[in-house]
Every structure is written in C-alpha cells, then in structure tokens.
Amino acid sequence: MIGQCATLLDIVLTEQPEPIDLQCYEQLPSSDEEEEEEEPTEKNVYRIEAACGFCGKGVRFFCLSQKEDLRVLQVTLLSLSLVCTTCVQTAKLDHGG
C-alpha cells in the first residue's frame, strides 16, 4: 500500500478459496431409542419383614419400589428398629411428629 487508502490493486491474494462442505453429518437417535430412555424402570411390590425393636414380634409392611431403591431401604433398616403397633399402644410411644 503506497497511498493513504488501500485500493484493489494493492491487495494481493496468495491463497485460493476452497469450497467448504456445510452438510451436518450428525445422527440423531431414532425414536425407538428415545422411547427406551424415557420409560421409567418397572416398580414391584415387596414385602418387608423385620422384628419389633421391643418385643421381637414380627413386623411386616409392603412397599412399591424399584429394585435399586429397595437396596437403599435395606441399608437404612440396618440402622433402624421397627416397632409393632401393640408396643406403640402399650408403651404409649405415639408421639406423633
């Protein structure tokens, strides 16, 4: 550039333009795969039996849960003691809450 403003003659192109592929080749998951991911896991009814923390009598209840959640309940029950309704009534343990 010799003058104050650049002219087209002053600009020298050394590289040639190349075509660019603008096509996106990303693949979206099919509708079958999406349905499998969105389906909730199956819940089953489980019977839970434990001994009363006071008298040792059997305490039973049922829950509806997934298998993974049942494992969490099992670990929790290791640190808790369930109490039967008879012991709650006779020992007046109904504190509410």
UniProtKB/Swiss-Prot annotation:
Q: How is it modified after translation?
A: Highly phosphorylated.
Q: Is Transcription regulation found in the keyword set?
A: yes
Q: Which InterPro entries match?
A: Papilloma_E7
Q: Give the residue ranges of motif Nuclear export signal.
A: 70-78
A single Gene Ontology CC term: host cell nucleus
Q: Which Pfam families does the entry link to?
A: E7
Question: Keywords for this entry?
Answer: Activator, DNA-binding, Early protein, G1/S host cell cycle checkpoint dysregulation by virus, Host cytoplasm, Host nucleus, Host-virus interaction, Inhibition of host innate immune response by virus, Inhibition of host interferon signaling pathway by virus, Interferon antiviral system evasion, Metal-binding, Modulation of host cell cycle by virus, Oncogene, Transcription, Transcription regulation, Viral immunoevasion, Zinc, Zinc-finger
This molecule's function is given as: Plays a role in viral genome replication by driving entry of quiescent cells into the cell cycle. Stimulation of progression from G1 to S phase allows the virus to efficiently use the cellular DNA replicating machinery to achieve viral genome replication. E7 protein has both transforming and trans-activating activities. Induces the disassembly of the E2F1 transcription factor from RB1, with subsequent transcriptional activation of E2F1-regulated S-phase genes. Interferes with host histone deacetylation mediated by HDAC1 and HDAC2, leading to transcription activation.
User: What is the name listed in the Swiss-Prot or TrEMBL entry for this protein?
Assistant: Protein E7
* Location of region: E7 terminal domain: 1-39
A single GO BP? symbiont-mediated suppression of host type I interferon-mediated signaling pathway
Q: Where are the zinc fingers (unnamed)?
A: 52-87
Q: What is its main location?
A: host cell
Q: Which family does it belong to?
A: Belongs to the papillomaviridae E7 protein family.
Could you tell me where this protein is found in the cell?
Host cytoplasm; Host nucleus
Q: Please tell me which stretches of this chain the record labels as motif LXCXE motif.
A: 22-26
Q: From what organism does this protein derive?
A: Canine oral papillomavirus (strain Y62) (COPV)
